[in-house]
Amino acid sequence: MVRVKICGLTCEEDVHAAAGYGAHAVGFVFEPSSPRYIGDRADVLELLRSVPPFVVRVAVFGSLRDLPADLWREVDAVQFVSGKAIALPLHLRRIRAVRLRTEEDVRHALRLQDEADALLVDAYHPQKMGGTGETANWRLARLLRDEATKPVILAGGLTPDNVCDAIAQVQPFAVDVSSGVESAPGKKDHLKVKEFIANVRRFADGS
């Protein structure tokens, strides 16, 4: 089955909904420019610790930056657009986000594989680094998926309505959704979360 990450979580209720409906991973944004930023909250450790066992906790950055040691201990993977991951704690998996507009971008993404455990394809935006609601280029994502030696995760404009088409075209290792299951930036619509995950499962079952 294609795995599911629900990204941009900001409260325990949304964490419990995502995990309860079957998300394999949840994302927490540590990029200050994002409306889903949680890095300055007093309860950030409690939020990270609210994730149930066997659900992967992903810290999401635009430009990679350091976090206090107590925060690093509470996450399992780091996702970033730019910056080297060489100083990260050894237990962290590294997800390199790439934005594809041309086949040259695909070739560049392939060269980044050595510094990542997975590649995440997101939609290109000139000012923003994710969570825009714009759809990624599925043709280029499939090209990357076919050539990559590391798992490819598809993000960018996914919704309950289009996720099955996206999986059929790209055949990714996982899908990643944020704005496509929200009622407002940073606030998840639990019915949309449920529908998104259910649709991925139905696709996997061939129904």
What do the PLM-derived regions correspond to, one by one?
Residues 1-207:
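Conserved N-terminal beta1-alpha1 strand-loop-helix module at the mouth
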